[in-house]
Amino acid sequence: MASQFASNSLLVLGAYGIIGFLYLVVIPLFLYFWMNIRWNFMNKFERLCLYGLVFLFFPWFDFICSFFKPKNSWARRDLAIDSH
């Protein structure tokens, strides 16, 4: 009974590990390289779908964007120009 529980626990942990690795590493890297290859040739529908996938598979992106403030002088200058 205990060995069956340990075996099932390892199987579940392994499945979570594989799914997490796919979700956090493999699919985001694929999307990144796909966007680099297709950036200048995408149509509107493909771009819309890729943006949706980016927000789905980059879970930290929403969190980081809400707190990110550029610290470079060129970024502040561009923001100041855009606000006028």
UniProtKB/Swiss-Prot annotation:
It is found in: Cellular thylakoid membrane. GO terms for cellular component: plasma membrane-derived thylakoid membrane. InterPro entries: NADH-quinone_OxRdatse_su_L. Keywords: Membrane, NAD, NADP, Plastoquinone, Quinone, Thylakoid, Translocase, Transmembrane, Transmembrane helix, Transport. The chain crosses the membrane at residues 10-30, 48-68. Its EC number is 7.1.1.-. It catalyses: a plastoquinone + NADH + (n+1) H(+)(in) = a plastoquinol + NAD(+) + n H(+)(out); a plastoquinone + NADPH + (n+1) H(+)(in) = a plastoquinol + NADP(+) + n H(+)(out). GO terms for molecular function: oxidoreductase activity, acting on NAD(P)H, quinone or similar compound as acceptor; quinone binding. It is a multi-pass membrane protein. Its main location: membrane. It is an enzyme of class 7 (translocase). The keyword Secreted does not apply. Belongs to the complex I NdhL subunit family. NDH-1 can be composed of about 15 different subunits; different subcomplexes with different compositions have been identified which probably have different functions. NDH-1 shuttles electrons from an unknown electron donor, via FMN and iron-sulfur (Fe-S) centers, to quinones in the respiratory and/or the photosynthetic chain. The immediate electron acceptor for the enzyme in this species is believed to be plastoquinone. Couples the redox reaction to proton translocation, and thus conserves the redox energy in a proton gradient. Cyanobacterial NDH-1 also plays a role in inorganic carbon-concentration. This is NAD(P)H-quinone oxidoreductase subunit L. The gene is ndhL.
